[in-house]
Amino acid sequence: MMFITSNINGRLIFVHDLVIFQKIKHFLNFCVVYFSQRASCCMDYAIFVFNLCFIPNLCVACIFNVATASIP
């Protein structure tokens, strides 16, 4: 399991280590997304649910595409 966080401005932070994630989540006002490599990707659905700060069961490629499109 990997973690991705998104702040109010839509910028993304990728957290690959659970320990680091546990540390930063306490003082950053971010919404958290959990994702898995097992699920299929659908970019339209990913971008849609990203606005709700929750992307269920998306693969890594899909997440990184969303991140690239979201960061100015």
UniProtKB/Swiss-Prot annotation:
Membrane topology: Single-pass membrane protein
Top-level taxon of origin: Eukaryota
Localization of this protein: Membrane
Parts of the chain that traverse the membrane: 46-66
Entry GO CC: membrane
Keyword annotations of the record: Membrane, Transmembrane, Transmembrane helix
Main location, first listed in the record: membrane
Other known facts: Completely overlaps YTA7.
Name of the protein described by the UniProt record: Putative uncharacterized protein YGR270C-A
Natural source organism: Saccharomyces cerevisiae (strain ATCC 204508 / S288c)
